[in-house]
């Protein structure tokens, strides 16, 4: 899909949730990417200001043309959305009217082979959104077998995680695994493609490594709490997710913050008592794409939108249960052989 335009998913639904056009305000686009949401937000309301954040310096550089054209209505900042409250305050804004988060990897990252996110075109095994720190190649070539199995099982939900980890170790003993194509071939040797699914055997393993390299679930956890701290009463938080690990964290956050106890489960070892409601639910469950959008934009098919409206209750302490969801739980180690 290289060269295809980026289409923001569930755009009409996000615009409706954020109630654009109801007067001047400030909205945070915590995941700028190719600028799809920011561009749509600016076009929908001439009185709106947008503070857009992206940890990827390439995305920030590419967005400067849009920022210049917005005439001061768009402020584009390089940073992590987990720090969005601090970033917003550094911009001289104490509270905002809306926050939108589109979680996960962007199409502009997937489409560039040199970024090393995708198995669809061979490139260096990198996956770093910021271009610094531990790369996927570092992890694949340096992590112990058990750690690789844990990462692939929990963050990729790959049932064959032990077999994949074992195959990676056998391959790296012969030579370092340096490219996305090499890793995809190793995984395809032990994971069978599901007939008729159209899903590449390496999909779950690549997802797991990307999440681990960029601490994506930890960032999501921090971003939800940061949004809670920076939204004014009546402000709204809209979060679009693309797989069950992300959606589970968002669902538990809104459940707990809307007055429901976070119940114990195999993912949440301890229940947490309800706290004063900091959010009311805007969406009573996940909102998915229309049939027309799913047909026009394949990326939208797995998208889910959840949203909440901030109350005037003080922001409580961060939920320990969400931090547990974002980490590797010891009892989920290994997966099946």
UniProtKB/Swiss-Prot annotation:
Annotated GO MF terms: rRNA (cytosine-N4-)-methyltransferase activity
Keyword Cytoplasm found: yes
Coiled coil: none
Disulfides per UniProt: none
A GO term from the CC aspect: cytoplasm
Gene3D superfamilies: Putative methyltransferase TM0872, insert domain (1.10.150.170), Vaccinia Virus protein VP39 (3.40.50.150)
GO biological process: rRNA base methylation
Biased composition regions of type Low complexity, renumbered to the chain: 289-300
Lineage: Bacteria, Pseudomonadati, Pseudomonadota, Alphaproteobacteria, Hyphomicrobiales
Protein name: Ribosomal RNA small subunit methyltransferase H
Protein keywords: Cytoplasm, Methyltransferase, rRNA processing, S-adenosyl-L-methionine, Transferase
Enzyme class: transferase
Top-level taxon of origin: Bacteria
Its EC number(s): 2.1.1.199
Reaction(s) the record says it catalyses: cytidine(1402) in 16S rRNA + S-adenosyl-L-methionine = N(4)-methylcytidine(1402) in 16S rRNA + S-adenosyl-L-homocysteine + H(+)
Binding site for S-adenosyl-L-methionine: 35-37, 54, 81, 102, 109
Similarity annotation: Belongs to the methyltransferase superfamily. RsmH family.
Pfam families: Methyltransf_5
Subcellular compartments: Cytoplasm
Stretches the record annotates as Disordered: 286-316
